[in-house]
């Protein structure tokens, strides 16, 4: 999964953003599991990049009204 820029995220449809968000969350979960198990991740900086990309997607969703207030 590639790291996305804000302009790329804004060009996506709400459904595409939601699908991308789920993929990134799954990848982040797997990366954190490897780290917690004591393994060395392939790219240690990837975890922070995943977190930032997830935040970017959620920010755009909030701006465009795609994200409910309770999330």
From Swiss-Prot:
Transmembrane segments: none annotated. Keywords: Ribonucleoprotein, Ribosomal protein. The gene is rpl29. InterPro entries: Ribosomal_protein_uL29, Ribosomal_uL29, Ribosomal_uL29_CS, Ribosomal_uL29_sf. NCBIfam families: L29 (TIGR00012). The lineage of its organism: Archaea, Methanobacteriati, Methanobacteriota, Stenosarchaea group, Halobacteria. One of its GO terms (molecular function) is structural constituent of ribosome. This is Large ribosomal subunit protein uL29. GO terms for biological process: translation. One of its GO terms (cellular component) is cytosolic large ribosomal subunit. It comes from the Archaea. The keyword Methyltransferase does not apply.
């Amino acid at each position: 999964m590639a790291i996305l820029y804000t302009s790329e995220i804004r060009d996506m449809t709400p459904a595409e953003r939601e699908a991308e968000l789920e993929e990134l969350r799954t990848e982040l979960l797997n990366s954190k599991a490897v780290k917690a198990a004591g393994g060395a991740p392939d790219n240690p900086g990837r975890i922070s990049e995943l977190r930032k990309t997830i935040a970017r997607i959620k920010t755009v969703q909030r701006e465009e009204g795609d994200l409910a207030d309770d999330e």
